[in-house]
């Protein structure tokens, strides 16, 4: 539920390496 400061509209979350996932076009972590 914490925004990772990255969008995932056109590309996947690069922050997925630290546990972030794409939700509603924005990368979130928990």
Swiss-Prot record:
It holds the Pfam family Cyclotide. It comes from Viola odorata. There is a cross-link at residues 1-30 (Cyclopeptide (Gly-Asn)). Belongs to the cyclotide family. Bracelet subfamily. Transmembrane segments: none annotated. This is Cycloviolacin-O10. The presence of a 'disulfide through disulfide knot' structurally defines this protein as a knottin. Keywords: Disulfide bond, Knottin, Plant defense. Expressed in petals and roots but not in leaves, petioles and runners (at protein level). Probably participates in a plant defense mechanism. Disulfide bonds join 4-20, 8-22, 13-27. This is a cyclic peptide. GO terms for biological process: defense response.
